[in-house]
């Protein structure tokens, strides 16, 4: 496998940075891993043709990672990754979000509609095939357009060859669009909920502790993959059986010490490690700032309603969690980028690059002027993108009515929608509105309109506010009240009844929610069209800047940015010092749960039966062998980002001893610049997971089916 390391041969591997492609691991990588304590033969770590550790790692759903921990398709992932699934099964009478869920038999496991688990099947370098088909593109937009079509053709050809609806094929770019791989996955669509801890365990600490260390969150949930009788992926059927995986990971209860080897394998979503300083400024001011302001307002309104009503809390729990996660991430990122001086680091890199280009003559001619072109483009797009972001966050991602009404002004779409069988149409609408509360959205809409009026140029949003100013004296609340009183869109029964009318398209074309939605999407489309040509020098610059820096620094490790494909990171168990006279240890224990427990708090109120177990202190076989305590979480120097949630943390022998679930506040700049002295991966200790399953859930059948050492 080492011979395939095309781009990274000769690089001096570093343990403190890198989301490495397993098929590109070099001799230097392996030597560094072994120096840190790794013991397995490298072929036992990654080999798609025979059982290996990496075979146990899966894409869970659409944006998380999981790990197979039994010969019967048992999957461990994070609680926040399984949150949507748990919420989908929760009702006021059966509140699994709050109370947890335990299945004591296969038949009690709950099928989750729409949830998939994907296993990596193959990966093939198609860079030469793609570049050979390029037809002298005039600019970067045309180049990317040609590449997209070539990739689609390659995907279609491979899908046709595989002839399976349960195979997913995709071509993904790497190294800033300088390399391409064609990847296939086996996709299992019969996935069932097996176990979930109470919400006060799985989300212990809530927003307050999110992205923070020390941590005491039991962030895990358990699912099972089912297959047909031939052990192949299949849609849900009562006749399906637990999947027998190629490899399942061994679970280790041995524990750990400072500086022990730790390795993550997962599917990190996105990083931007090689962007210049002006791109960082754009991220902070034109993307993060609008997200922080708008979501903060929206979430305050949501939270008040959720605290007042249990049904609303259940409906909005998942939406709130998704929104608040990257709201707080954006706050932390901006603070860390400033505190750690990332802009100055980037400017120093740019100055060094410009000096190298100037000194290299014709050799570096292709890179001349690319930074100044990119800087000019960012200056032009900044204010436009900022306003576009406010509009998107507030009226497309903030209030829900605008997205709900999208397309209902198109008569052809309405006629097609209305032509469906009544039962099918009713089910579809019911599914769409399952977690929607019109009265709450009615409160959100005026707040979102107000922020758009404050932050977006008046002439750009005049189509929205001319009516509000003329008919309602500029009063956004009065406008929102009238819209919800006169529209059928917020109410599923009214919408269904309207769609069954022969003149449904005509009625909906005049609906106030549809009229608002049409205006919002027209304005947003105008923004997008204005921004599109400005991205051309940026896309071109990013590709060439990466290629140029690699030429400038041939011995420097430059692992490809994350792109939701399988990566590994290796490091060690280690604490850190976030400030003068402050030292954080590398693990937490159950004592911290008792210290944080607060019956008056919605975030720190421990579930009563679980609290009794913690107070009792009978850890059994799950106690640490050295100190006798129940370890809850630990931190490591691994390099992860969003998408790594649920990633198994493997020890030196390739055994799972934790599940990665978060990063630390002081290093929220990590997606842009890795800071080895501060950046840590926060991991739930597998022994805490097993303690919860065993002692609280009394679910010995799950313990028995795992390989635990």
PLM regions: where:
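Bacterial N-terminal signal peptides
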Residues: 1-8
């Amino acid at each position: 496998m080492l011979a395939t390391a095309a781009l990274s041969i000769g690089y001096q591997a570093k343990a403190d940075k890198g989301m490495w492609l397993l098929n590109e691991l070099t001799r230097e990588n392996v030597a560094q891993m072994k120096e840190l304590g790794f013991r397995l033969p490298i072929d036992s770590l990654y080999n798609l043709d025979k059982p290996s550790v990496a075979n146990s790692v899966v894409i869970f759903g659409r944006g998380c990672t999981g790990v197979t921990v039994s010969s019967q398709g048992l999957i461990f992932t994070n609680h926040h990754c399984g949150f949507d699934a748990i919420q989908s099964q929760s009702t006021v009478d059966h509140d699994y979000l709050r109370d947890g869920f335990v299945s004591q038999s296969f038949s009690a496991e709950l099928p989750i509609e729409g949830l998939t688990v994907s296993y990596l099947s193959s990966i093939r370098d198609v860079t030469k095939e793609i570049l050979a088909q390029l037809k002298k593109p005039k600019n970067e937009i045309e180049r990317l357009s040609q590449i997209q079509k070539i990739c689609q053709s390659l995907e279609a050809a491979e899908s046709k060859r595989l002839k399976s609806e349960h195979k997913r094929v995709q071509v993904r770019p790497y190294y800033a669009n300088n390399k391409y791989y064609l990847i296939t996955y086996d996709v299992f669509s019969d996935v069932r909920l097996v176990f979930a801890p109470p919400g006060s365990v799985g989300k212990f600490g809530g927003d307050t502790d999110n992205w923070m260390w020390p941590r005491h969150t039991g962030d895990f949930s358990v699912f099972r993959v089912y297959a047909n009788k031939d052990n192949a992926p299949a849609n849900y059927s009562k006749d399906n059986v637990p999947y027998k995986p190629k490899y399942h990971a061994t679970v280790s209860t041995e524990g750990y010490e400072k500086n022990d080897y730790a390795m993550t394998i997962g599917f990190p979503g996105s990083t931007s490690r090689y962007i210049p300083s002006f791109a960082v400024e754009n991220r902070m001011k034109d993307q993060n700032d609008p997200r922080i302001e708008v979501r903060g307002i929206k979430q305050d309104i949501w939270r008040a309603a959720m605290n007042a009503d249990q049904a609303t809390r259940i409906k909005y729990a998942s939406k709130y969690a998704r929104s608040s996660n990257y709201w707080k991430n954006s706050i932390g990122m901006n603070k860390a980028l400033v505190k750690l001086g990332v802009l100055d680091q980037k400017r120093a890199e740019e100055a060094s690059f410009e000096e190298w280009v100037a000194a290299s003559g014709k050799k570096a001619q292709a890179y001349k002027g690319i930074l100044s072109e990119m800087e000019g483009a960012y200056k032009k797009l900044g204010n436009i993108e900022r306003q576009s972001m406010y509009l998107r966050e507030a009226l497309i991602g903030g209030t829900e009515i605008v997205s709900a009404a999208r397309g209902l002004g198109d008569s052809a779409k309405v006629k097609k929608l209305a032509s469906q069988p009544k039962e099918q149409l009713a089910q579809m609408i019911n599914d769409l509105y399952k977690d929607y509360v019109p009265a709450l959205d009615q409160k959100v809409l005026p707040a979102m309109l107000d922020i758009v009026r404050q932050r977006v140029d008046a002439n750009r949003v005049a189509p929205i506010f001319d009516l509000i100013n003329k008919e309602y004296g500029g009063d956004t609340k009065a406008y929102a009240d009238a819209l919800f009183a006169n529209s059928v869109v917020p109410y599923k029964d009214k919408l269904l009844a309207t769609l069954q009318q022969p003149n449904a398209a005509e009625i909906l074309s005049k609906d106030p929610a549809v009229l608002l939605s049409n205006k919002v999407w027209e304005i947003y489309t105008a923004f997008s069209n204005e921004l599109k040509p400005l991205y051309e020098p940026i896309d071109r610059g990013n590709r060439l800047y990466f290629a140029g820096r690699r030429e400038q620094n041939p011995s420097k490790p430059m692992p490809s940015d994350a792109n939701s494909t399988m990566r590994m990171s290796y490091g060690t168990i280690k604490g850190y010092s976030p400030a003068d006279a402050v030292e954080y240890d590398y693990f937490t224990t159950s004592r911290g749960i008792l210290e944080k427990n607060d019956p008056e708090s919605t975030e720190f109120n421990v579930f009563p039966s679980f609290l009794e177990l913690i107070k009792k202190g009978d850890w059994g076989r799950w106690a640490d062998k050295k100190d006798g305590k129940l370890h809850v979480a630990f931190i490591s120097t691994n390099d992860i980002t969003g998408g790594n949630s649920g990633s198994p943390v493997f020890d030196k022998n390739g055994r799972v001893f934790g599940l990665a679930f978060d990063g630390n506040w002081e290093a929220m700049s990590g997606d842009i610049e890795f800071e080895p002295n501060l950046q840590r991966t926060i991991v739930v200790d597998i022994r805490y997971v097993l303690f919860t399953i065993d002692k609280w859930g009394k679910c010995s059948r799950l313990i028995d089916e795992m390989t635990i050492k």
